[in-house]
């Protein structure tokens, strides 16, 4: 359930590059396959790769096409090389067309800092995402909602009194050419996290901005959790003097373990989406019914709904960590957004027993590209 203006902004964001062009599509698929091939060569030559539950992802992709629904995968964020290396653990047969290449979100200040990188990552189907104060109501999130919305369901956008609108379908060409709904992969923590023992392989809280993709897509996406370990051994955050040195492979022979979990129950997703629909009916702006009202963006009920759904997603990823991988239980503090905000604000002094390897990039002071002034009020998630 989405708003017309959200879908249109998603289209506009995707149209920043000529994604319908045959040349772009060829270069995009070639870039993705080349990156996949080089990553696969590195992993299977230098490391001990273990992939568990691949059949669950394969089945989810088949369901996505059969049921005309987007696919969303959700994973913990251990290192700067999680993407693309995680996809190199998968078999070649999965990537038989550009439609099977995942879309992902990448930090604007890292992946899009110059024209060459911007084109490279855009060809690799990465969406530029800004952090620190921009918040979840930005182009990459709108674009992800659009990608998860099948092209033939755009008339399912919300309008007052359940009226059906087909404005987007008139003389309309989608910003991308595809034969089925897209696959969007997210790292809901927003930042890499590597902690010293006994807290290794733990997660931050999940930012609620990514829940917009589930709540606002025209049809409920299939949501698959993934938990991975080992990539932090390839790219350790302990190397802080150079980003290039940080991503240079090390610890050859280490185990890389990627475990794919069961999709979230459709009834669970539907329950959250029904709550969202209720809030939309209650708080839409009669003067601008085609877009999110301030209450739907920043209101207490809307934020609570997104926060609960984000916690639900985290719990499903943590379940793989705890019940399938049998790793030591996470410290219960780590699932609390308020704990992390206090920990980041005090730069770790609030809980000195928790030590971050390298820099804690969630601390605003560490982001040199930012101006010194504080974040705009009401946009923090």
From Swiss-Prot:
Class of the enzyme per the UniProt entry, highest EC level: transferase
Pathway recorded for this protein: Phospholipid metabolism
Intramembrane intervals: 26-47
GO CC annotation: mitochondrial inner membrane; mitochondrial intermembrane space; mitochondrial membrane; mitochondrial outer membrane; mitochondrion
Keywords noted in UniProt: Acyltransferase, Lipid metabolism, Membrane, Mitochondrion, Mitochondrion inner membrane, Mitochondrion outer membrane, Transferase
EC number in record: 2.3.1.-
Transmembrane segment boundaries: none
Predominant subcellular localization, coarse grouping: mitochondrion
Cell location: Mitochondrion outer membrane; Mitochondrion inner membrane
Chain ranges for the short sequence motif HXXXXD motif as given in the UniProt record: 77-82
GO molecular function, one term: 1-acylglycerophosphocholine O-acyltransferase activity
Catalytic activity: 1'-[1,2-diacyl-sn-glycero-3-phospho],3'-[1-acyl-sn-glycero-3-phospho]-glycerol + a 1,2-diacyl-sn-glycero-3-phosphocholine = a cardiolipin + a 1-acyl-sn-glycero-3-phosphocholine; 1,2-di-(9Z,12Z-octadecadienoyl)-sn-glycero-3-phosphocholine + 1'-[1,2-di-(9Z,12Z-octadecadienoyl)-sn-glycero-3-phospho]-3'-[1-(9Z,12Z-octadecadienoyl)-sn-glycero-3-phospho]-glycerol = 1-(9Z,12Z)-octadecadienoyl-sn-glycero-3-phosphocholine + 1',3'-bis-[1,2-di-(9Z,12Z-octadecadienoyl)-sn-glycero-3-phospho]-glycerol; 1'-[1,2-di-(9Z-octadecenoyl)-sn-glycero-3-phospho]-3'-[1-(9Z-octadecenoyl)-2-hexadecanoyl-sn-glycero-3-phospho]-glycerol + 1-hexadecanoyl-sn-glycero-3-phosphocholine = 1'-[1,2-di-(9Z-octadecenoyl)-sn-glycero-3-phospho]-3'-[1-(9Z-octadecenoyl)-sn-glycero-3-phospho]-glycerol + 1,2-dihexadecanoyl-sn-glycero-3-phosphocholine; 1'-[1,2-di-(9Z-octadecenoyl)-sn-glycero-3-phospho]-3'-[1-(9Z-octadecenoyl)-2-(9Z-hexadecenoyl)-sn-glycero-3-phospho]-glycerol + 1-(9Z-hexadecenoyl)-sn-glycero-3-phosphocholine = 1,2-di-(9Z-hexadecenoyl)-sn-glycero-3-phosphocholine + 1'-[1,2-di-(9Z-octadecenoyl)-sn-glycero-3-phospho]-3'-[1-(9Z-octadecenoyl)-sn-glycero-3-phospho]-glycerol
Membrane-protein topology: Peripheral membrane protein
Chain segments carrying region Required for membrane insertion: 215-232
Segments on the Mitochondrial intermembrane side according to the record's topology features: 1-25, 48-381
Ranges in a coiled coil: none
Biological process terms in GO annotation: cardiolipin acyl-chain remodeling; cardiolipin metabolic process; inner mitochondrial membrane organization; mitochondrial ATP synthesis coupled electron transport; mitochondrial respirasome assembly; phospholipid biosynthetic process
Similarity section: Belongs to the taffazin family.
Function: Acyltransferase required to remodel newly synthesized phospholipid cardiolipin (1',3'-bis-[1,2-diacyl-sn-glycero-3-phospho]-glycerol or CL), a key component of the mitochondrial inner membrane, with tissue specific acyl chains necessary for adequate mitochondrial function. Its role in cellular physiology is to improve mitochondrial performance.
Other remarks in the entry: Present with 1340 molecules/cell in log phase SD medium. The enzyme was named after a masochistic character Tafazzi, once popular on Italian television, apparently due to the difficulty encountered for its identification and characterization.
Comment, domains: The HXXXXD motif is essential for acyltransferase activity.
Protein name per its UniProtKB record: Tafazzin
